[in-house]
């Protein structure tokens, strides 16, 4: 499935994505994650010691150091090797899961495959996930394609990202989303590692979640609205290439750039779906999309998530040289919420009440 010219275009796009996420205003505006609308009921008698709080938990049957995941970011170009090495080192240090960026480029060309493989070298024992996009899945991945991606990382699972809004705005985007669900079902049936399906910042609602659960996925990452808008990232790229926006009316553009379901809406709706349909209880939920602190992580757990994930905030911390310190702060945020609700363990925190402002 290699195509060297397509691989070169993908490399250039990946470099541009990282630069824009670091330096451009690509966050949602006028729409938030919704985390700020909720607060924990304070427990004036926690009856636990802060020093004894245990943040460890499980994900897909594996023990992890904390309910936090380094979300899919990048790979597939030379500079990505350094970024992924540093992310992998942090994930290994804290024993938290790590997802790599889209591996489409590895299907198009063998160039820069090492930028993905480096993650397992520096994260030899923690959970590590390969990643491919819905447009590639829709075309029908061969078993050799899937095996190559998994073997390159010695991956513990495969993430399929749903990015319809991003593809719509991307100058070279692929907007043919026929057969995505069918091919996800095929992947679940033929792949011997867990399949995780995630959005990229527009959210997964209950109806789509039900379809994906029925297809056989083992985890869903809601990746709701309120964090990074990939429409805005691609709009920047479009304007750089063409100078002005002629595809959409000015009256609709702002709504399209901020299109999506807020993260907390996704979490609460899917929690209700799982409550009403017990056959889905074992499917684990990842909260992402604007997660910006350990308090957001704590609230996510109380809303039914197994863990939370972050990409852009951790990328900024990595760029600033503060990745380890930032994760440590987030874990202290989480422990503070646990202490003040009387939850000595992550499972205990899941039972605590959230109140709505």
From Swiss-Prot:
<dbReference type="InterPro" id="IPR000262">
    <property type="entry name" value="FMN-dep_DH"/>
</dbReference>
<keyword id="KW-0413">Isomerase</keyword>
<dbReference type="GO" id="GO:0000287">
    <property type="term" value="F:magnesium ion binding"/>
</dbReference>
<dbReference type="Pfam" id="PF01070">
    <property type="entry name" value="FMN_dh"/>
</dbReference>
<comment type="subunit">
    <text>Homooctamer. Dimer of tetramers.</text>
</comment>
<keyword id="KW-0479">Metal-binding</keyword>
<dbReference type="GO" id="GO:0016627">
    <property type="term" value="F:oxidoreductase activity, acting on the CH-CH group of donors"/>
</dbReference>
<dbReference type="GO" id="GO:0006207">
    <property type="term" value="P:'de novo' pyrimidine nucleobase biosynthetic process"/>
</dbReference>
<comment type="similarity">
    <text>Belongs to the IPP isomerase type 2 family.</text>
</comment>
<comment type="function">
    <text>Involved in the biosynthesis of isoprenoids. Catalyzes the 1,3-allylic rearrangement of the homoallylic substrate isopentenyl (IPP) to its allylic isomer, dimethylallyl diphosphate (DMAPP).</text>
</comment>
<feature type="binding site">
    <location>
        <position position="131"/>
    </location>
    <ligand>
        <name>FMN</name>
    </ligand>
</feature>
<dbReference type="GO" id="GO:0010181">
    <property type="term" value="F:FMN binding"/>
</dbReference>
<feature type="binding site">
    <location>
        <begin position="102"/>
        <end position="104"/>
    </location>
    <ligand>
        <name>substrate</name>
    </ligand>
</feature>
<feature type="binding site">
    <location>
        <position position="198"/>
    </location>
    <ligand>
        <name>FMN</name>
    </ligand>
</feature>
<dbReference type="InterPro" id="IPR013785">
    <property type="entry name" value="Aldolase_TIM"/>
</dbReference>
<keyword id="KW-0285">Flavoprotein</keyword>
<protein>
    <recommendedName>
        <fullName>Isopentenyl-diphosphate delta-isomerase</fullName>
        <ecNumber>5.3.3.2</ecNumber>
    </recommendedName>
</protein>
<dbReference type="GO" id="GO:0070402">
    <property type="term" value="F:NADPH binding"/>
</dbReference>
<dbReference type="GO" id="GO:0004452">
    <property type="term" value="F:isopentenyl-diphosphate delta-isomerase activity"/>
</dbReference>
<feature type="binding site">
    <location>
        <position position="167"/>
    </location>
    <ligand>
        <name>Mg(2+)</name>
    </ligand>
</feature>
<keyword id="KW-0460">Magnesium</keyword>
<feature type="binding site">
    <location>
        <position position="71"/>
    </location>
    <ligand>
        <name>FMN</name>
    </ligand>
</feature>
<keyword id="KW-0963">Cytoplasm</keyword>
<dbReference type="InterPro" id="IPR001295">
    <property type="entry name" value="Dihydroorotate_DH_CS"/>
</dbReference>
<feature type="binding site">
    <location>
        <position position="102"/>
    </location>
    <ligand>
        <name>FMN</name>
    </ligand>
</feature>
<feature type="binding site">
    <location>
        <position position="166"/>
    </location>
    <ligand>
        <name>substrate</name>
    </ligand>
</feature>
<dbReference type="InterPro" id="IPR011179">
    <property type="entry name" value="IPdP_isomerase"/>
</dbReference>
<feature type="binding site">
    <location>
        <begin position="13"/>
        <end position="14"/>
    </location>
    <ligand>
        <name>substrate</name>
    </ligand>
</feature>
<keyword id="KW-0521">NADP</keyword>
<feature type="binding site">
    <location>
        <begin position="311"/>
        <end position="312"/>
    </location>
    <ligand>
        <name>FMN</name>
    </ligand>
</feature>
<dbReference type="GO" id="GO:0005737">
    <property type="term" value="C:cytoplasm"/>
</dbReference>
<dbReference type="GO" id="GO:0008299">
    <property type="term" value="P:isoprenoid biosynthetic process"/>
</dbReference>
<keyword id="KW-0414">Isoprene biosynthesis</keyword>
<feature type="binding site">
    <location>
        <begin position="72"/>
        <end position="74"/>
    </location>
    <ligand>
        <name>FMN</name>
    </ligand>
</feature>
<keyword id="KW-0288">FMN</keyword>
